[in-house]
């Protein structure tokens, strides 16, 4: 069954719902701040899923050499560039900000395709999706019902750990020639990233609650990107762990 039309229809319906909920008289509103942020997160996940499914169904991955280091770094810099542009643009620049965000989310979908293929080929895709969803629900519930357990002072520590983890991952890709050694340390790093992005999800959810209370001009796209990336990275690293790669 071709599920792409269903995803596209869901994207249109959700996009219309966001417009009706997040805007009043064509202006952003702080009302339903948390709900609107999560609607953007769900919309982001739907766009990523659609991108991956389109690439899979039409074999578009054959035009991109994902195993090439040069291709990896090109997509890495493009994705980071679009992320920075999206975060920099004012939420009042509605069309430009949404266009930049859409390109960024699509790039995430393209770069996620090898993980999707890995999960599909090793038959761990469904179980990984379930595990990711379970972790997200549990941690989100904790963040909303026990916000006092989470401190915004975690930010510098989490940021240092994230940068260190990314540098280790890049170093592993560049300098490790033996595939067995690479896989071993890659899995160890993935366990570390699962813990790190779980903590980041708690932190970002707490920050969402604080921003909702202090809202003056809502920035739903920026707010949603942090939690969206936490979820994507949880899924990616859980897939690597379950696939043993």
Sequence positions of predicted segments:
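A hydrophobic alpha-helical transmembrane-helix feature that marks the membrane cores
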Residues: 1-245
């Amino acid at each position: 069954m071709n599920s792409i039309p269903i995803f596209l229809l869901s994207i249109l319906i959700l996009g219309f719902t966001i417009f009706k909920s997040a805007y009043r008289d064509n202006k952003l509103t702080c009302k339903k701040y948390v709900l609107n942020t999560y609607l953007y997160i769900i919309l982001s996940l739907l766009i990523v899923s659609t991108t991956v499914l389109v690439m899979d169904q039409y074999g578009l991955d054959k035009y991109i050499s994902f195993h090439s280091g040069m291709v990896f770094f090109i997509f890495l810099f493009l994705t980071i560039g679009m992320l920075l542009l999206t975060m920099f643009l004012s939420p009042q620049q509605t069309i430009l900000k949404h266009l930049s965000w859409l390109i960024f989310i699509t790039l995430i979908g393209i770069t996620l395709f090898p993980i999707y293929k890995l999960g599909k080929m090793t038959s761990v895709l469904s179980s990984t999706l379930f595990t990711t969803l379970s972790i997200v629900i549990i941690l989100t519930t904790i963040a909303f019902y026990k916000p006092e357990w989470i401190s915004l002072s975690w930010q510098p520590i989490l940021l240092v750990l994230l940068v260190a983890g990314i540098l280790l991952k890049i170093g592993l890709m560049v300098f490790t020639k033996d595939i067995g050694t690479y896989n071993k340390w890659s899995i160890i790093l993935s366990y570390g990233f699962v813990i790190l992005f779980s903590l980041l999800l708690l932190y970002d959810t707490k920050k969402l609650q604080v921003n909702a209370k202090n809202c003056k001009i809502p920035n739903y796209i920026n707010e949603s990107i942090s939690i969206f990336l936490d979820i994507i990275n949880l899924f990616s690293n859980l897939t690597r762990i379950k696939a043993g790669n």
